[in-house]
Amino acid sequence: MLLFLIILLPVVFKFSFVSLSVLQGWDCSEGSSSGKGNSTCVGPEPFLIFSHGGSIFRIDLDGTNYEQLVADAGVSVIMDFHYYKERLYWVDLERQLLQRVFLNGTRQETVCNIEKNVSGMAINWINEELIWSNQQEGIITVTDMKGNNSRVLLSALKYPANVAIDPVERFIFWSSEVAGSLHRADLNGVEVKILLETSERITAVSLDVLDKRLFWIQNNRDGSNSYICSCNYDGGSVHFNKHLTQHSLFAMSLFGDRIFYSTWKKKTIWIANKRKDMVRINLNPSFVPPGGTKVVHPLLQPKAESDAWAPGQKLCLRKGNCTGSVCEQDSKSHLCTCAEGYTLSPDGKHCEDVNECAFWNHGCTLGCENIPGSYYCTCPVGFILLPDGKRCHQLISCPSNTSKCSHDCVLTSDGPICFCPEGSVLETDGKTCSGCSSPDNGGCSQLCLPLSPVSWECGCFPGYDLQLDKKSCAASGPQPFLLFANSQDIRHVRFDGTDYGSLLSQQMGMVFALDHDPVENKIYFAHTALKWIERANMDGSQRERLIEEAVDVPEGLAIDWIDRKFYWTDRGKALIEGSDLNGKHREIIIKEEVSQPRGIAVHPMAKRLFWTDMGINPRIESSSLQGIGRRVIASSDLVWPSGITIDYLTDKLYWCDAKQSVIEMANLDGSKRQRLAQNDVGHPFAIAVFEDHVWFSDWTMPSVIRVNKRTGKNRVRLRGSMLKPSSLVVVHPLAKPGSDPCLHQNGGCEHICKERFGSAQCLCREGFVKAPDGKMCLALNGHQIPPAVGSEADLSNQVTPLDVLSRNRGSEDNSTESQHMLVAEIMVSDNDDCGPIRCGTWGQCVSEGENATCQCLKGFTGDGKLCSDINECGTSTTVCPPTSSKCINTEGGYVCQCSEGYRGDGIHCLDIDECQLGIHTCGENATCTNTEGNYTCMCAGTLSEPGQMCPDSTPPSVLMEDGRYSVRNSYQECPPSYDGYCLYNGVCMYIEAVDRYACNCVFGYVGERCQHRDLKWELRHAGQGRQRQVTVVAVCVVALVLLLLLGLWGAHCYRTKKLPSKNLKNPYEESSREVSRPTDSEAGMASCPQPWFVVIKEHQNLRNGSQSMALKDSEAADVSQFSSRETGSVQLPSRRNEPQVYMGAEQGCCIPPSSDKGPGPHGMQWGFHLPSCEAQPIALGVEKSQSLLSANPILQQRASDLPHQKKLTQ
């Protein structure tokens, strides 16, 4: 029967996003459990009970724990519960029975027979009474919880139908369906009052015992329209929610801000917000309409204040081992009663443990050990305890494990019996062991704490609270929620499907990679179509591009919230890169032996990276954060390993294979690999884990699926207008342990910030108290402390990222349509009402009674059966300006890729003013002029090429004192959050024209954030630098040469002054001796350099030629001997009669001049040999020449022919 219901009657939940519910933080009340240590009081999760097709089911509001409580309940549309007795009561109208069962589905029993025509029932949980109405007889009857002592409370009523009571206010309410009226009386049956009368039918009533309001369902007479109405307990302040729904409403229940109601026509159960007129959840049992519906939670049955014990009556003192159900108050006698295993102390105030082992009635065959409230049997070495927990048997192992025992088998006289290790017990199947020493961890979701060899209890890690089932652990603090990339937008949704909406949707193109930073509360995501990586606040504001260049196909991204870095995979470039959270210090982590990386996860505590590779050698790999120490985690039985995540509490690795449709898990080193789910997971892309569940996205049926992280069971599918749900992120202070929000802006606290379980708690200094916002501090100043102000902040009251988002959107009137129209649907099975119609991934099936059609998603079109993508770029309408951008079609949308010289947001492209932003390449002395999509450079009124240098006559006018480019207009400064945004001393400014933040860069840097070097500028200035270097080198060489020449000239002057003292001989005698030995002088010419000598030349006019022709040949020959190899001479030009001196510099030994021919008949040469073998440059004046002539008669004779008015000059 149960299998039949699961297959044919799937239950479907539909949700849309809501504001905060009262579930975020409950006050500690009776029935709620308190956490350990300093954790706050935590209430249990509410769940729903409803009747359906002759059975009664229960299910959590998030779609999990869907169970059948009663298989054969009959026609049971009337039901109620007693929370503190943990009982469910219902009326079987067909058998005329009042029945009950425990809330866990055990111990079903009949309470009593009941009359016909019972139309309503309610439980007085304070007075322990049952109240029901009989529409046919017009009476309301009261009885005790066992069906005894019945009495008529009210009679002579007009068709009383539905009944509701508030035992705290001591009121009973009922409706008259025929008369269309509402009534009220006290619980004594007096003070009857008519609250409302209408001509329409009233089909259901329910109470909000917290807000003290009465709700009812009102239908028009033909049943076409239904709506929910409410009023206060006096019948005033009536509110009609006519636009809540158009379906035929039937049953109703309330909890907090939500209304649970069932419908006839749609055969569904919905949840709506009772104040905002918005539908929230849809339960879809396909064929049979649901009956009674009740939400179960202790807040729905509060205790009355008058029920509190008097000081002298509060006798039950809880201390020591007196916890949980050990001490119980008897509601009538106000005395303490003790649980099994305890006895009341003599003073009647305490419960004391009973030592069962001392009374010899324990039944143990060999040994007994007492523990508080119980005992257990023990066995000596060599014996094992049989499954009955009493008998010991010698350990004789079975020859073969034919019984398929999960642990081991022992041979007994009754045959082979399975037994379990110490700390575990045998399950009812007789084969499986359960306990701390068994694979199921004793059923505990986190910690299993042994109490005895056969008993244990479950515990939780710090920051988690044990739930009422004493097995599951839930994170304390705010409600967690999911962030996921949906290709064309980023969405958020709570685990129960509420608060479902779009976070970022403005022309996202294609986004697959996503992660969340819990410290700064920002999201990081990568655009596959636009090819950049950016971040934004949780409300979608302050979007910043971090990585814009050299990005191809980024499909995975992970934040290191401890070391403040992020890493991403690029499947197109086949590498893994990393950067700090501001986009600085980008580096390649993995580039060798990687083919198609996709998913990536980081373990900050272990300092390791984990990623998936979908390439030719599919595998799961790991490395250090620097890319070294690579290790293969898994390489076998993989095809397309896609998403990967880490359970930081248990150090387990989870991944999914998109091709094989499997979910797997293993230790961080790859050991203990286990397949968690298979075949029913579709095409998984990404995966996330938190608390007891693993979430993964599915592309086959666009949705998000959840399974138990240990067993892979209890699968729930969450869907709703999804395109391609990709990366998944759980947002909660404990989702990424070790994060300290106090590190960023002091956690938002004015005075003191204290981190506790990933949340920031604000404290105030002495003399101050916290303001109601929990962040600011108020001075006492002798005034009374404001209400709701304390010194510590409860985790349950912490402001979450989604809280801020909800408040911001609640205050906005221009919320997008998609944010209001998104509706999520939770499916317990994959079956729906669409039957054979399959809409594919681009459409969603919508059932209307017997018909079902495909409703295409936004950006797609279809014929009711199939949907296809609309190519916006191929339409006649120009969606992207062709002059400034290029249109790129994506699934369900498009993006505008800006051309060079433009910048945009994926829709609009605006011209970049390169001149203002300082990203042009005009020369230092050039004037930059912005143009559409480009710019021009002016050099003294003449156009020049970008990068060309202008003459120095045009001084630069765009450089400020700090080395930055000046701008023509004044701009707003960037907010403090942009500190460090501009790199390399750039200045951040806000440009209103493009609605962007930009950087004013210093010379040599360009880019949006001044992150790139200006290569053209560097090359240009490098060329100028080389020219300057060559000039400097040339100047240095010239200077050195000049210094060398100056040194030589100084040495020459010095030796010239020293020459007279060293050279005392008569120069004529020396020269006459050399003249008499011409042969020797010629022989010596080869080894000695030419000596210094003087040649006196005279050139006369032709009119005086007789004198020169009168010379004898012998005399001419004698003179010609002094003219050989002259290096210096004095010429006496005949035309200007000015002697000239030519000086030589060769030194060595004394060499007589060789004979050489003179200049001919027009002149003659006179040579004077300097007699010093160390000849230095000397000057010969007139006096010196006369002395030489006087010493030589021949020279004197020949010199007499020269004109006497001619002067010798140097």
From Swiss-Prot:
Biased composition (Polar residues): 1120-1134
PROSITE patterns assigned to the protein according to its UniProt record, in alphabetical order: ASX_HYDROXYL, EGF_1, EGF_2, EGF_3, EGF_CA, LDLRB
UniProt KW Transmembrane helix keyword: yes
Residues of this chain annotated as glycosylated in UniProt: N38, N104, N117, N148, N321, N401, N814, N851, N925, N934
Compartments where found: Membrane
Extracellular topological domain: 23-1029
Ranges of the LDL-receptor class B repeats in the UniProt entry: 86-127, 128-169, 170-211, 212-258, 480-520, 521-563, 564-606, 607-650, 651-693
UniProt main location, coarse: membrane
InterPro entries per the UniProt record, alphabetical: 6-blade_b-propeller_TolB-like (IPR011042), cEGF (IPR026823), Cueball_EGF_LRP_Nidogen (IPR050778), EGF-like_Ca-bd_dom (IPR001881), EGF-like_dom (IPR000742), EGF-type_Asp/Asn_hydroxyl_site (IPR000152), EGF_Ca-bd_CS (IPR018097), Growth_fac_rcpt_cys_sf (IPR009030)
Protein's job: EGF stimulates the growth of various epidermal and epithelial tissues in vivo and in vitro and of some fibroblasts in cell culture. Magnesiotropic hormone that stimulates magnesium reabsorption in the renal distal convoluted tubule via engagement of EGFR and activation of the magnesium channel TRPM6.
Subunit: Interacts with EGFR and promotes EGFR dimerization. Interacts with RHBDF1; may retain EGF in the endoplasmic reticulum and regulates its degradation through the endoplasmic reticulum-associated degradation (ERAD). Interacts with RHBDF2.
Name of the featured protein: Pro-epidermal growth factor
Source organism of this protein record: Felis catus
Lineage: Eukaryota, Metazoa, Chordata, Craniata, Vertebrata
Name of the encoding gene: EGF
